């Protein structure tokens, strides 16, 4: 009887240990953004506004994705250094920075977005309107943060590999007055439905991804992606790969 109790206790202890390990692994969760550089707004088309990805985004596992088209893997040390530097540059900055008095007025240009995940686990983002045009009127830390992320983007463009994903964001923009001969709507790709004002967007996966990539190859000019739906409506069809956390 004493031996049986001991065996039961050991079994329960082992089961408890296994449960604790599973819980720990579940809490780790997927990789998260830890640093980013992107843009918002500006004088761009509705399609570009929806499809525009971060210029460069760094994930907790060291993966760098640039323009949702190129990727590069950093070492743990490089990832940690990048996050630490971005945190130094952005800590204490307001959510929306303003240039010093005397800065020239600049309109219709994108707002630069810089971000880093702090030690508290929260994403700190700073927006700087027209940073490229009036950098001298902003704190130098913002330009340094952008320079750091720009360096990652340059590395990925030169030595990275193509980024692909199993999920795609597609956008159909109404083109009733477009010139040129439209192609039939690609089989397997969802047709726009409901309100289109002025665009219709949908995230797709599976066979639809292969179908849209075949119909509109990556990098193809929008002027060559004119399609007619089964109802006769004309649309310009565009897409990009979704990022891991989208």
Predicted segments, located by residue:
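Sec-dependent N-terminal signal peptides
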Residues: 1-7
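Generic marker of residues within folded, mature protein domains
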Residues: 4, 48, 104-106
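C-terminal motif of bacterial Sec signal peptides marking the signal peptidase cleavage site
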Residues: 10-13
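Short, well-ordered, aromatic-rich surface patches in folded extracellular/luminal domains
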Residues: 15-43, 95-246
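Extracytoplasmic low-complexity, Pro/Thr/Ser/Ala/Gly-rich segments
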Residues: 20-78
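Residue-level marker of positions within ordered structural domains that often coincide
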Residues: 63, 87, 119
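Charged, amphipathic alpha-helical segments
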Residues: 78-103
């Amino acid at each position: 009887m004493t031996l049986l109790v001991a065996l039961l206790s050991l079994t329960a202890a082992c089961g408890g240990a296994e449960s604790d390990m599973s819980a720990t692994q579940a809490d780790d969760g997927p990789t998260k953004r830890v640093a980013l550089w992107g843009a918002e707004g500006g004088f761009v088309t509705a399609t570009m506004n929806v499809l525009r990805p971060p210029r460069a985004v760094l994930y907790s596992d060291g993966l760098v994705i640039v323009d949702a088209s190129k990727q590069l893997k950093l070492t743990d040390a490089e990832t940690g250094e990048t996050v630490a530097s971005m945190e130094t540059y952005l800590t204490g900055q307001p959510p929306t920075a303003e240039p010093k008095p005397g800065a020239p007025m600049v309109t219709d240009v994108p707002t630069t977005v810089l971000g880093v995940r702090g030690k508290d686990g929260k994403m700190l983002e700073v927006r700087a309107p027209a940073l490229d045009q009036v950098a001298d009127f902003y704190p130098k830390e913002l330009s340094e943060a952008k320079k750091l992320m720009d360096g990652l983007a340059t590395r990925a463009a030169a030595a990275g590999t193509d980024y692909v994903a199993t999920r795609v964001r597609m956008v159909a923009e109404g083109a009733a007055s477009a010139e040129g001969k439209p192609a039939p709507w690609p089989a397997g790709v969802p047709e726009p439905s409901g309100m289109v004002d002025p665009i219709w967007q949908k995230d797709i996966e599976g066979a639809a991804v292969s179908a849209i990539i075949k119909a509109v190859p990556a990098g193809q000019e929008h002027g060559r992606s004119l399609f007619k739906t089964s109802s006769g409506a004309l649309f310009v069809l565009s897409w990009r790969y979704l990022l891991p956390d989208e």
